[in-house]
Amino acid sequence: MKVKPSVKRICNKCRVIRRHGRVMVICTDPRHKQRQG
């Protein structure tokens, strides 16, 4: 899980979602997981 000030999709499988007011990227590749914070 990477924590970044700005989250972006890395590949086509990445999905930008909101959970509990946080913007997150979920993907089939675990290295692409990101959270804004």
Swiss-Prot record:
GO terms for molecular function: structural constituent of ribosome. Keywords: Ribonucleoprotein, Ribosomal protein. GO terms for biological process: translation. The keyword Phosphoprotein does not apply. Pfam families: Ribosomal_L36. PROSITE patterns: RIBOSOMAL_L36 (PS00828). GO terms for cellular component: cytoplasm; ribonucleoprotein complex; ribosome. Belongs to the bacterial ribosomal protein bL36 family. This is Large ribosomal subunit protein bL36. The gene is rpmJ.
